[in-house]
UniProtKB/Swiss-Prot annotation:
Its main location: membrane. This is Suppressor of tumorigenicity 7 protein-like. Keywords: Membrane, Transmembrane, Transmembrane helix. Coiled coil: none annotated. It comes from the Eukaryota. The chain crosses the membrane at residues 24-44, 68-88, 475-495, 502-522.
Length: 540
């Protein structure tokens, strides 16, 4: 056993050396084989009647009219144009080149290539140590802590613009959340619970509302039905608050229902301007149910405290939740950056900073901004109003465009209120990308940026919104190649049609120049080798 264990480390090294030697030798064998084929073709040109074939081909080409060349180049331009259109459509939809994907996925394994682990960056920690992190974990979808009310807010947007702000995928996730949260114990379903279970799955809002009223007819104390009516039928926040209070009376001791309803009541108070009341309700909720931290109620609290401009209380909440062991969010990172930027932004000047350098406080603020931008690089474009905002989705993808939309929608006003904070952000946020030149492979303070955010964000955000992509993808080689080929063929077709004789002279000169090295090589071979040897070889 000892011998076998001792020989194992040497085996992989010998195997790798053998493989590299075979690859090296195979390259030269292929080159030698190609040279031998060319030599044999030249030697056997008389038995194979290659000269006669070439002469016949040249006669045929000389008899072709310019119209043939126009048709040929026009057809080539059309085909390459169709390929270009398909490649561009595929790239816009899936973010990759179709030809490149087929080559890597199907042709490369057949040719013996080893696939690079494209997701290797997703498994690397900040220090470069590999960790078993899967794409599913990286692209986990979270409930938006500040999600709007469908009836009182989302529906108003639809009435005004005629556009649907929520996708079916997003609403389907919400339906699953509600079924799990309110009807977790499927073994003891009451009749009204069965009705509500179907109601959450309905796509049509009116069908959901009718099912909620049906559940109330079965049981006047059905809290889940009042929750649905408050979320979807109430057209004002005041009406939604009244229905939530009715639901709270009927919730009894159902912890999930109580937490959900109290949180939404606090959000109603926040939207109606009773901010201190909302803060008190959120604090009480966090004290009463400390184990429900995954609901991210502290993000609601942070936003309300920022509205009160209670920055000391905001810092206290951050000190508790901005911990290395807890999952981060854009709210945590950017609120921390806002507090540090606020302390120096009113006196910050890029010209003065370039002359005297950054002070310690300014350096801390810049580092906090870099940290926030590394976590979610999409947020600054919305805060700086370089991209238009839309209504946030009900679910977000951390570090994705959906989270950036949700954060900026509620926090843009707080950044504007801090004098000079947006100016400091504008001057420094792009410096983050110099720290992390390859964000998909290695991060600086966080894990490498997940490569799956674009696909998930396209499912969460409506189609009329242009999803922000990071890092910005360059056009694949095959799109550029087909564009050049299409343009070149079209130009040749036009020139051949306009100047047929001149293009004919040009084509003949081009091919004469192209085959001149082959003729020179053949003459040298004939002068180098004895004529009797060629005669004997051709008679074999």
């Amino acid at each position: 056993m000892a011998d076998s264990s001792g020989s194992n480390p040497q085996s992989p090294g010998f195997t790798e050396k053998l493989k590299s030697w075979l690859c090296w030798s195979w390259t030269y064998i292929c080159a030698l084989w190609f040279a031998m084929v060319l030599t044999m073709v030249y030697v056997l040109r008389s038995p194979l009647k290659l000269q006669e074939t070439v002469n016949a081909a040249s006669v045929f080409l000389n008899t072709l009219t310019p119209k043939f060349y126009v048709a040929l180049t026009g057809t080539s331009s059309l085909i390459s144009g169709l390929i270009l259109i398909f490649e561009w459509w595929y790239f816009r939809k899936y973010g990759t080149s179709f030809i490149e994907q087929v080559s890597v996925s199907h042709l490369r394994p057949l040719l013996g290539g080893v696939e690079n682990s494209g997701s290797a960056g997703l498994f690397s920690s900040v220090n470069g140590d590999a960790e078993p992190r899967s794409n599913v974990a990286e692209c986990k979808v979270w409930r938006n802590p500040l999600n709007l009310f469908r009836g009182a807010e989302y529906s108003r947007y639809t009435w005004v613009t005629g556009k649907e702000p929520l996708t079916y995928y997003d609403m389907n996730l919400s339906a699953q959340d509600h079924q799990t949260f309110f009807l977790g114990d499927t073994q003891q379903l009451r009749p009204e619970d069965s009705v509500m279970q179907k109601a959450w799955r309905e796509r049509n809002p009116q069908a959901r509302i009718r099912a909620a009223y049906q559940a109330i007819e079965l049981n006047r104390e059905c809290a889940a039905a009042y929750v649905l009516l408050a979320e979807e039928e109430a057209t004002t926040i005041t009406e939604a608050e009244r229905l939530f209070k009715q639901a709270l009376k009927s919730a009894g001791k159902d912890t999930n229902l109580v937490v959900y309803i109290k949180r939404r009541l606090a959000m109603c108070a926040r939207k109606l301007g009773r901010i201190k009341e909302a803060v008190k309700m959120m604090r009480d909720l966090m004290k009463e149910f400390p184990l429900l931290g995954m609901l991210n109620i502290h993000e609601n609290l942070l936003e309300a405290l920022l509205e009160l401009q209670a920055y000391a209380d905001v810092q206290a909440v951050l000190a508790k939740y901005d911990d290395i062991s807890l999952p981060k969010s854009a709210t945590i990172c950017y609120t921390s950056a806002l507090l540090k930027a606020r302390a120096v932004s009113d006196k910050f000047s890029p010209e003065a900073a370039s002359r005297r350098g950054l002070s310690t406080a300014e350096m801390n603020a810049v580092e906090a901004i870099h940290r926030a931008v590394e976590f979610n690089p999409h947020v600054p474009k919305y805060l700086l109003e370089m991209k238009s905002l839309i209504l946030p989705p009900e679910h977000i993808l951390k570090r994705g465009d959906s989270e950036a939309v949700a954060y900026a929608f509620f926090h843009l006003q707080h950044w504007k209120r801090a004098e000079g904070a947006l100016n400091l952000l504008h001057c420094t946020w792009e410096g983050t990308f110099r720290i992390i030149p390859y964000p998909l492979e290695k991060g600086h303070l966080f894990y490498p940026y997940p490569g799956c955010t674009e696909t998930a964000d396209r499912e969460l955000l409506p189609s009329f919104h242009e999803v922000s992509v990071y890092p910005k993808k360059e056009l694949p080689f095959f799109i550029l190649f087909t564009a050049g080929l299409c343009s070149f063929c079209a130009m040749l077709a036009m020139l051949t049609h306009q100047f047929p004789e001149l293009m004919g002279v040009f084509v003949k000169a081009f091919f004469s120049t192209l085959f001149a090295p082959l003729g020179f090589f053949a003459d040298k071979m004939e002068s180098f080798m004895p004529s009797c040897l060629w005669h004997q070889l051709t008679n074999v």
